[in-house]
Amino acid sequence: MVKAIEFLNKHGFMLRGFLDLPENAEAIVVFLHGFTGNKTEHAGHFRNFSRLLSKNGIASMRMDYHGNGESDGEFYDFRFDWAVEDAYLMLEKAREIKGIKKVYLLGFSLGGAIASIVANDKDVDKLVLWSPAGSMVEHADLFYKNHKHLENGNAYMAGFELSYKFVETIHQYDMFQGVKNFTKEVCICHGEKDLSVDINLSRRYNKEYKNSELHEIPSAGHGYDQVEERDKLYGYSLDFLLR
């Protein structure tokens, strides 16, 4: 059963999304979306994969960060440090669901970087990273530098007002700082033709995690736009979560 859910973060923003809870589900996947993305994600990947999970008896939670999608706030309210807090809150709410015994975390792009930061052996049982943006600090700097600056200090970027606070707060983090905190199983997927996030970042994650597997998907770009690319992405991830 899919139902709309919402909960308040500590900064007063209501986070909104969907909970898909199959009957007798004992495991749940918490999804973390990418930069300028949302709980459905590019090409419907999060929605599609959540439906596939449900058919296999696994629950899922897909939320928008504050300032994104249907959650409270505007994109100019979006801060990296608060997004990290949002992710911790999502994990907390997932653990509170009756009957759930295992919590898995899946992050795409920016969400992959955040997932790698928040995943720890106490709160997460398995970790899935799709094209994790380990270079997000550098990307944020470039986004901010290369777009028109507004009087309030923010930058206007292709329809999105990027807050200087996002850029400031992301510098508080190393995108690889959380690797040491997670020793359980990790599944990483990355397109070989990704022009947005260098595949070498996934190779580094794979090398630094103690219990990791990497699937490099031929011809796939950052969005996994072709059916065969999508099927491999979903297939590798589902097989990993079911075993």
Regions found by a protein language model. Give the residues of each.
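N-terminal cap/lid segment of alpha/beta-hydrolase-fold proteins
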Residues: 1-24
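Short, surface-exposed "cap/lid" segments of acyl-processing enzymes
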Residues: 23-55, 60-64
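Catalytic nucleophile-loop/oxyanion-hole region of alpha/beta-hydrolase
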Residues: 68-98
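Alpha/beta-hydrolase fold nucleophile elbow
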Residues: 98-109
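Hydrolase active-site cap/lid region
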Residues: 121-162
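Short beta-strand/loop motif that positions the catalytic acidic residue
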Residues: 182-183, 188-190, 194
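Conserved alpha/beta-hydrolase "acid-adjacent" motif
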Residues: 195-201, 225
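Catalytic histidine-centered segment of alpha/beta-hydrolase-like enzymes
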Residues: 220-234
